[in-house]
Amino acid sequence: MAKEHFNRSKPHVNVGTIGHVDHGKTTLTAAITTVLAKRGLSELRSFDSIDNAPEEKERGITINTSHVEYQTANRHYAHVDCPGHADYVKNMVAGAAQMDGAIIVVAATDGPMPQTREHILLARQVNVPRLVVFMNKCDMVDDEEMLELVEMDMRELLSFYDFDGDNTPIIRGSALGALNGEPQWEDKVMELMEAVDNWVPLPERDIDKPFLMPVEDVFSITGRGTVATGRIETGIVKTGDEVQIIGLGAEGMKSVVTGVEMFRKILDEGQAGDNVGLLLRGIDKDQIKRGMVISHPGKITPHKRFKAEVYILKKEEGGRHTPFHNKYRPQFYIRTLDVTGEITLPEGTEMVMPGDNVTITVELIYPVACNVGLRFAIREGGRTVGAGQITELID
């Protein structure tokens, strides 16, 4: 069969498999690619190729993850699967892509286990909008009542963590059966993908969000003015656009973009993902510096205090050798900026051990442009000791 040309017209969605160890996450991932490959929508990926997950570095943290891609009739998916529990925690808190939805795998033979609960909580903390449940190993359970019990437990658990437990699709299947080509279980994988298509919402594309660019470098061109360079994070910027420059005490600085350049070529507009230089009217070179953010006016505000979900590196990962306590003051590396901040631990938490995953409140020494979902690294003496993402802005 001739290879289909990669089609960008389908909307792109990031998903992943989560759930307790040995409940069948990786087998399901392999089964999805196998079943979709038969329908010409995916490349087949074997269990072993997914299980031997390569190491990646993200914000100074090593994470083992496998990336698989596939399509349904309606969407293009990038799917992540992690081998170990710690890799899941790290990937969800500090990984590259925000998950737009997740497939939580639960074995019908066991029902929900501690990591099932932990992964659902984590999905809630990092704002994964919706989960779909795949009840695996149903070919090993003869008792219909047992299946209904597991389904009830899962719905209760989802509701407890503020997901829509009543309406979340729960598919009963067998990943191994589907992987082995048994038609009744292959159909269940197709049913699962249909549920993911319909239940997981389409993410807002970066290009459709308001314009925002963290400043990486600044220089001046004689006779033309000041140029700020950086990678556009979201949105679109055109010549003539009014922008605001915020962070590092530059509150309310406004300017007009008089040119957008990329590799010394003039662009009509810069888009999310482009590395550009913006020529800014009426701004002196010393008024703007690395770490500030340029955005459309009023779309993003500077904040000093926020709540965050963080993962603290183990000693073996290059992290701290000792725990830290309340009022710990490391540096927070946010976008292109290093800023000192003070950590307040949740009530009743005395200290945080290397390897822990915890919700903290941070107070920075000055306001920084930030938003919910923004990921950052925690550094001490130039090395990364943790990573996290903002879950709530306080002030």
From Swiss-Prot:
Membrane-crossing segments per the record: none
Signal sequence coordinates: none
Annotated region described as G1, given as residue ranges: 19-26
Annotated EC: 3.6.5.3
Region of interest: G3: 81-84
Keyword Nucleotide-binding listed: yes
Superkingdom classification of source: Bacteria
Pfam families the record matches: GTP_EFTU (PF00009), GTP_EFTU_D2 (PF03144), GTP_EFTU_D3 (PF03143)
Example of a GO cellular component annotation carried by this entry: cytosol
Region (G4): 136-139
Residues the record lists as binding Mg(2+): 26
Region (G2): 60-64
Class of enzymatic activity (EC top level): hydrolase
Assigned keywords, A-Z: Cytoplasm, Elongation factor, GTP-binding, Hydrolase, Magnesium, Metal-binding, Nucleotide-binding, Protein biosynthesis
Domain tr-type G stretches: 10-204
A single GO molecular function term of this UniProt record: GTPase activity
Region (G5): 174-176
PROSITE patterns in alphabetical order: G_TR_1, G_TR_2
Residues that coordinate or bind GTP: 19-26, 81-85, 136-139
Localisation per UniProt entry: Cytoplasm
Reaction equation(s) it catalyzes: GTP + H2O = GDP + phosphate + H(+)
HAMAP family: EF_Tu_B
UniProt similarity note: Belongs to the TRAFAC class translation factor GTPase superfamily. Classic translation factor GTPase family. EF-Tu/EF-1A subfamily.
Subunit text: Monomer.
Its job: GTP hydrolase that promotes the GTP-dependent binding of aminoacyl-tRNA to the A-site of ribosomes during protein biosynthesis.
Protein name: Elongation factor Tu
Organism name: Porphyromonas gingivalis (strain ATCC 33277 / DSM 20709 / CIP 103683 / JCM 12257 / NCTC 11834 / 2561)
Lineage, broadest ranks: Bacteria, Pseudomonadati, Bacteroidota, Bacteroidia, Bacteroidales
